[in-house]
Amino acid sequence: IGHFSIVEDNTVIGSGCTLESHVIIKSGTTLGDDNRVFDGAILGGLPQHVHIPEQPGRVMIGYGNTIRENVTIHRALVTEHATIIGDNCLLMVGSHVAHDCHVGNHVIVTNNALLAGHVHVDDRAYISGAAGIHQFCRVGTLAMVGGQAHLVQDVPPYVTVDGLSSLVVGLNKIGLRRAGHDQATIHDLMAAYRIIYRSGLRWAEVLEQLRTRFPTGPAALFYEFLSTTARGIVSERRTPPGATIKLRDTVVAEPQQPQVRVKFG
């Protein structure tokens, strides 16, 4: 436990944990084994809510997590509930996890990203810098959210959300390969993706297609996720037909006449 750190009563800190300087572990917080908490982090603060209960819930943090400088994690609103961080997560500088959030395993939340109350982030998701996730939204497994994205709907598993438009731009193929998924699995995921975003089917038909064509395997998670969404899902960013990326200005400047200096006298 580093210099000037504070550990309040009613806390549990597992073996092998490291608290750097100026860390505050507030009442109602449980840390599993082998967590490292960097300078200035505050874990277990009261929920930011207009009606703070006298006995809020807990913060439950698993094992092997890295919690960087000035991260804040707040307790749940209801006594029997908890804000949960799984195992082997990385919460980077200044990120915030609000009350009643559930963060899975191997999740990365980068600098200054904000998870509002009741947000669920599934395993191996990646939240880029300064992204903001609205209350009660869910981010699916192996989804990647781009920097400065602002999300008010659920992000399906395996997809990438562009930070500028806050819209889906395709599968997170790099993340899928890093997670060990082979090309056949990625092919199935791409087929399911096209059903969701490019088939033109009605919502009930999309769900039926996913249920019947992909009953097992990673692609089956699309049906499970979409059939339980309460907020709807993030739309796809569509490029107009025939559009291309302008690599440089195509306007050709008219050749300039050479300047002739005339000497008088």
Positions of the model-derived regions?
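Terminal amphipathic alpha-helical/low-complexity segments used for targeting or macromolecular assembly
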Residues: 34, 40, 51, 64, ...
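Structural signal for interior beta-strand "rungs" in well-ordered beta-sheet cores
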Residues: 1-167
